[in-house]
Amino acid sequence: MVKSLAVERAGSSAIRDLLEITEQPEIVSLAGGLPNPATLPTDAIARAAAAALEDDPLGALQYGPTEGYRPLRRWVAGRHGLAADPHGEEHVLVTSGSQQALELLTRALVDPGGLVALADPAYVGALQALRAAGVDLAAIPADGDGLCVDALADRLATGERPALVYVVANFDNPSGSTLSAERRVALAALADRYGFWIVDDDPYGDLRWHGEAPVPLRELTDRTITLGSASKVLAPGLRVGWAVAPVEVRRAMTTLKQSADLHTSALTQQIVHRTLAEPGFLEGHLVTLRTTYQAQAEHLVGALRTKLGDRMTVPEPDGGMFVWAELLDTTADSAQLLDPAVAAGVAFVPGAAFGVERLHPTRMRLSYATADAASLDLAVDRLAGVIPAP
Amino acid sequence: MVKSLAVERAGSSAIRDLLEITEQPEIVSLAGGLPNPATLPTDAIARAAAAALEDDPLGALQYGPTEGYRPLRRWVAGRHGLAADPHGEEHVLVTSGSQQALELLTRALVDPGGLVALADPAYVGALQALRAAGVDLAAIPADGDGLCVDALADRLATGERPALVYVVANFDNPSGSTLSAERRVALAALADRYGFWIVDDDPYGDLRWHGEAPVPLRELTDRTITLGSASKVLAPGLRVGWAVAPVEVRRAMTTLKQSADLHTSALTQQIVHRTLAEPGFLEGHLVTLRTTYQAQAEHLVGALRTKLGDRMTVPEPDGGMFVWAELLDTTADSAQLLDPAVAAGVAFVPGAAFGVERLHPTRMRLSYATADAASLDLAVDRLAGVIPAP
């Protein structure tokens, strides 16, 4: 009686169990996508909370509109090329993290049994939300330039009709890849031709420390829904994210959000707006984040190449939070390495967790975001003791 | 392409539009269930926010467990008769308002096309969540003692098998009625016999200023899921609620919550825990709330009986936030009175908004929670100018 289809579809809680295990202080976790605690701007958040409750207690504590706090919606619109549009905020829905945005838009745009295309491997949280919604998944291959849009085009040519194509175009989770400019143009053209929606889940785009960002998908086609979040640039515990979408899509999502949770916390929306919109704050904070993550990424990649270079290949990230390492032993199974790794005091996420159709047994996602350099060294030493030498 | 079945089912946004209209300052709104702004404990919340960010910034700002902040879960368990259970918090899921709890448990326990029984009239937010989930609704009559459990028993005897029976057993929204002790016993016995779950949505139980509360349903059968909220006893803008449920149900809801929004804001959970668990705070604040709402209820009922006693009957509430007034003109349609009422500067919610199968045209829900005495007088004067004399 207890488990409905929705619960069954949402699947196991293996990742949640893993993240709980890695909360043990003796384990160095490369598993989660948690910001480095030292980067959390606690003082700015405390000032914003105090100011919101002092200046606008009713706005922070009373029921608010389902669409979100209007100044935050305006700020988000401005960051997404809508600054000149007097009704730009009509494109914006504030959500309880971008996870909720994905869940709402899936339910708003895809009926159960409908089709969603996405890269294989794909973000675990997206897989959970999509599977819980009862949609079918079309797994598209991906490489260092992101989703293989040619392969998607072939599937479309055979008559497959996804309602959505989901991408993390900037610093993909788990693969770290960025969708190339050429593929963005091609993907946008396919969206216009076949009438599907592109969901560009973009929590990491601001965390680029090297190279130029390709043109955003939203500038290439109106059939783009961009998801953003305060989790990686401010603090995940606030649970504030957003969707920027065509107004008709935003309205459909709003209807579902009203029955899902009425609205996102008015207080945390005010905190996010007061910090992110404070002149100079975000630019300065992004410099801190990029510098921190670049240093940690270079440290992790360097240590992995030094101590495990004979056993894995490790790409050099230009941004984001993840390295998608590949074991050179083609018979390896990273899922079977996890228990010994945790026993040795280090955690990662095995490739299988991100599998849509394939298991990615030679892959492991390693996050350099959370741990400092000394902890990263310790983690690599422990990994080296667990991954068999060639 | 934009509107899925889920959006269609979730229905129109008439109530949201109404609540937006009533934000205009020249309108006295008896429409929403918003706490009187004067009762919001802004200082206590500001102190709690500052303390959380000072004492436990990581706990307030980093990702947290999907189940919720453990000290808050323990506190909720203690308020629900589980203080002596060393694992009492395992029964508790913290949610983004009790609205989310209802949505999650519906998806966890009822597949699309399954049956949910509830009183007609019923809470609008419940109707939206249930309809969005695609479940069928069995409308059960209700009277001044709440859901007519005999009528439910008759339906069960004919072979109908609801997966859930939804009640607001204390100070129902919209009817204001409290489910009698006898009916609680009978409902619990039916749950045990037929194996359905009782959802006892209880945001108003603490707002009782007269009489004794009947025994809680959770003490009568283990097949009870109790929903609670900080919205009415603290502040709705925090969006913190909870479900207290058998562990297997709590686990199924947790799986769906993970894909819905990962977890509820860690900061607002800490604020709610630090205020509600502070010795003496809640007891004192509930005295303030009960005194305020009792005075406002008596003021509204008195004014309605004085100025509209020839046109409506008005029950005297013992708690909660709502009066479910009945127009004496049996041909009246409260939905048609709304536009002239808003034009005259007063808003209410017409009975039709709460209809499951019936339209309740002679009914109107009037909230005395938000407005002070002078505004309530103004509202009644304006209503008297709109409701036709006999």
Where are these regions (language model features)?
Chain A
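Conserved PLP cofactor-binding pocket of PLP-dependent enzymes
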Residues: 27, 203, 342-365
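Conserved core of the PLP fold type I
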Residues: 59-194, 205-223, 293, 322
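Active-site PLP attachment segment
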Residues: 206, 219-252, 264-267
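Conserved glycine-rich beta-strand-loop-beta hairpin in the small C-terminal domain of fold type I
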Residues: 291-301, 313-326
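Short, conserved charged micro-motifs
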Residues: 331-337, 374-378
